[in-house]
UniProtKB/Swiss-Prot annotation:
Record flagged with keyword Cytoplasm: yes
Family that this chain belongs to: Belongs to the WD repeat peroxin-7 family.
GO cellular component, one term: nucleus
SMART domains from the UniProt entry: WD40 (SM00320)
GO biological process annotation, one example: protein import into peroxisome matrix
Organism classification: Eukaryota, Fungi, Dikarya, Ascomycota, Taphrinomycotina
GO molecular function: peroxisome matrix targeting signal-2 binding
Protein task: Receptor required for the peroxisomal import of proteins containing a C-terminal PTS2-type peroxisomal targeting signal, such as 3-oxoacyl-CoA thiolase. Specifically binds to cargo proteins containing a PTS2 peroxisomal targeting signal in the cytosol. Cargo protein-binding triggers interaction with PEX21 and formation of a ternary complex composed of PEX21 and PEX7 along with PTS2-containing cargo proteins, which is tranlocated into peroxisomes by passing through the PEX13-PEX14 docking complex.
Quaternary organization: Interacts with PEX21.
Ranges of the WD repeats in the UniProt entry: 57-88, 101-132, 145-176, 187-218, 231-262, 274-306
Main location per the UniProt record: cytoplasm
Protein name as it appears in the record: Peroxisomal targeting signal 2 receptor
Keywords from the UniProt entry: Cytoplasm, Peroxisome, Protein transport, Repeat, Transport, WD repeat
Length: 308
């Protein structure tokens, strides 16, 4: 297990680089995102531990981070002032691009592994925007309603056109970029807090709710989950699928734990309680045997640990 403290900055989002084995990015906030500034950290993961490679300070909170799928030196971060920013690690002073179309905080971001130009952002203004590369403006906007804040967004791992997202109306919905509107949704009695796709089975989608449960669905039948996974004591904040042929799920929860679930066994196979505050995000590394996981939380700590 490796760890690094980020004094004064609480972790909100973490992602291993998909292109460089030893790089990891963290988006962090001050004052728990209720005001103040943000910081983008770029770390090197070495045999001696996690080393701070560089960081970028911004004037508002940073709620999400995603590496570019095209350039190993570029990182997108979404900001509390409604802006999307692109940083280049070879230019350490400030972002090389800044887009500002959202009317409220951007709290969710994802990139697409099929069409590597695609970046998607979700905001508390109730909209999701689709961006392509470095074009000066977004190319599509989905309006989910001004009274419904977007919570999470996730592009499909094998389709360049499919997006899943959750919002404060409690639903998980799906959007095909070739259409101007959402086309189906998951509705359960409890509020859905986050979602993600399987990396190995293109039909599988995972959600979690404020009743502390994780649900596994076949997208062809969203009325009945294939599996319901229990273990967390408070709501799940983030779900990520492993890269292995046998899907495993890593979760981050407000109960201050991360857990590993096996949907086929319908069970939690590991509980990790390294953090002393809310765990805000987790991510699996694409490299090696795919067993390394990073987690960040409001305890101002980054941990990298083995799933097994």
């Amino acid at each position: 297990m490796l760890s690094l403290r980020t004094p004064g900055f609480q972790g909100e989002s973490v992602q291993f680089s998909p292109l460089v084995e030893n790089k990891i990015a963290v988006a962090a906030v001050t004052h728990y995102g209720l005001g103040g500034s943000g910081r983008l950290y770029i770390h090197d993961v070495t045999p001696k531990g996690i080393q701070v490679c560089q960081h970028y300070d911004v004037e508002d909170s940073l709620f999400g981070v995603r590496w570019s799928q095209n350039c190993e030196n570029q990182v997108y971060a979404c900001c509390g002032d409604g802006s999307l920013r692109l940083f280049d690690l070879t230019m350490p002073s400030k972002p090389i691009h800044k887009w500002k179309e959202h009317k409220a905080e951007i709290v969710a971001i994802d990139t697409n592994t099929v069409d590597r130009r695609i970046v998607v952002t979700g905001s508390w203004d109730g909209t999701i925007k689709l961006w392509l590369g470095n074009l000066p403006n977004s190319v599509q906007t989905l309006n989910n309603g001004s009274n419904s804040r977007i919570l999470t967004v996730a592009t499909h791992y094998s389709s360049p056109n499919l997006l899943g997202y959750t919002s404060s109306d409690g639903l998980c919905k799906f959007w095909d970029f070739r259409s101007s509107d959402k086309f189906m949704s998951i509705e359960i009695p409890n509020q859905i807090t986050c979602m993600n796709w399987s990396k190995s089975n293109h039909r599988m989608v995972y959600t979690a709710d404020n009743n502390n449960l994780v649900y596994c669905y076949d997208i062809a039948n969203l009325k009945t989950p294939l599996s319901v996974l229990s273990g967390h004591q408070l709501a799940v904040r983030s779900i990520k699928s492993s890269n292995s042929a046998h899907d495993l799920l890593a979760t981050a929860s407000y109960d201050m734990t991360s857990r590993i679930f096996d949907p086929e066994q319908h069970s939690c196979i590991r509980k990790v309680d390294l953090h002393s505050e809310f765990v805000r995000d987790v991510d699996w590394s694409d490299f090696g045997d795919g067993s390394w996981i990073a987690s960040v939380g409001w305890d101002e700590s980054l941990y990298i640990w083995n799933a097994f």
